[in-house]
Amino acid sequence: MSFSDRNDSPETPESSGTGTPVNSNRASASYITNMWTGLIRRFSSEGSFPSQADTAYDDNFNYHDGNGHNTKDGINGVFSPVRRTASPMRPPPLDPLILHGYRQGTPSSAKLLSAAVAEEIRTMVPERLRIVDDWNLIYSLEQDGASLATLYQRCRQFEGKRAGFVLVVKDLEGGVFGAYLSEYPHPAHTYFGNGECFLWRASNITPLPPPPSADTTNLNSRNTTLAPPPPSSEANTPTHSRPASPTPSEAVRFKAFPYSGLNDFCINCETGFLSVGSGGGHYGLWLDNGLEVGHSSRCETYGNEPLSDEGTKFGVIGVELWVMGV
């Protein structure tokens, strides 16, 4: 067959056109060039020192002997967990709380929430509210009168807002206790709130901590002892005046009872009462509509102890409601 005869034959898909062999040769040349360039770069950089990040990675994750076997993988030797170092980044310290809302003429005895107890409650609230350093007084029995309806009315402005609320109660014996509420108190036909809620109490005790032999096996609460403040001295005290007779110092023990998860009876409010936690026929904290009588018993929602030293039923002489995060 002559050369002209070969040109007249129909082209097949395998031999069609003359551009394919040329493009294939160019691609092959480019691939070889890139391969040699990469090898040259790799061999030229082998003599460089490893970075600190590479060294740290090798120290933490590579446990190989001279033969390349992993000696700490649990098979060829005793397993060793990865060595981790603490991050140097630390959150800034929280600013001290500032309590707003007490009137100028309110006596100190009528101020139920102290700064020390408020700081303890602060450690238990959600992180988004823990950084808030301003708490505002919504309702005070001393300043606004004994009425649950007034308390509800003052809370309506916070509807739909992601704020936190601290309920403070003082009984006839001077005990201070209460609850943290994830929603504002309002009359409702069903329970509301979530697992962020908790009950708490603060009681005066002697400065001595509990003995080391105390049984803490079934302890289901947070317990903190707050030292009493140092006695203040007057700068202009007359030299002839006699010092007051010393009185035994007192400390405050703070206990919190977080959500147990046994039920969802966190908050229940009606026009006739306000309650926090229930189950087993008992309320964790219950107040009547006149804010005169209260009940507190162990409940399933928080697994708490009775909050008042008077017993399961107590008389009320003070109520406050604080808000944060607005």
Swiss-Prot record:
PROSITE patterns: TLDC (PS51886). Transmembrane segments: none annotated. Belongs to the OXR1 family. GO terms for biological process: response to oxidative stress. Residues 1-26, 209-249 are annotated as: Disordered. May be involved in protection from oxidative damage. Residues 10-26, 214-226, 233-248 have a biased composition (Polar residues). Disulfide bonds: none annotated. It holds the Pfam family TLD. This is Oxidation resistance protein 1. Signal peptide: none annotated. It comes from the Eukaryota. The lineage of its organism: Eukaryota, Fungi, Dikarya, Ascomycota, Pezizomycotina. The gene is OXR1. One of its GO terms (cellular component) is nucleus. The keyword Lipid metabolism does not apply.
